[in-house]
């Protein structure tokens, strides 16, 4: 439900839990936002990393009205592992809003792109399909490995069902440790760095986020260290 204080403001759609938004979900959000004059900022940076059973729907593709009431942010940095080249795209159909964005990125001096990033983006989008398909298969296999490991060794720590991306949320409420404290203790006591769920707001309290975009041996070692940590509490 859109609160009255949001009328005329902005709403940011992001996915920190690995869900692939269904078209009908986006339609419901978009209709509410348009009705209340809310601009949707859709963070679609992980859009290429969708598992075969699911389908990515660009928010702006739903209708012309949605396109003009949204700002879409994408980048090849996640799917093609080129974050160090610092390049991204802001897609905005509304001319007035686009002018404000252009002025803002110039005022903040983040408008210039890395020439190597431009070339890497062109190569990634034009010639990276085979590599990307293999990556998605590997990421899904990593998730299935983690899911089976948790069922067998960590049943008291449920994880989200990953539909895309490489970020898995684990429910650690039973430990009774604040997420930020748990983050530091895992680093100091287990040599394992996970992200505290509270980085996404109070709703993330009690959750930890795993990045499984790594060799399976690294993931296995991380799960082993986490298991050892919780068993020694």
Question: Could you tell me what each predicted segment is?
Answer:
Residues 1-8, 13:
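Single conserved hydrophobic/aromatic residue that forms the stacking wall/gate
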Residues 14-39, 46-82, 96:
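Active-site pre-lysine segment of PLP-dependent enzymes
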Residues 115-118, 122, 138-147, 159-172, ...:
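Conserved glycine-rich beta-strand-loop-beta hairpin in the small C-terminal domain of fold type I
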Residues 66, 176-178, 185-194, 200-233:
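PLP-dependent enzyme catalytic core of the Aspartate aminotransferase-like
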Residues 99-106, 124-147, 179:
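Structural signature of PLP-dependent enzymes
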Residues 65, 92, 96-116:
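Active-site C-terminal subdomain of aminotransferase-like
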Residues 65-67, 81, 95-100, 129-131, ...:
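Short helix-loop capping/hinge motifs at secondary-structure junctions, enriched
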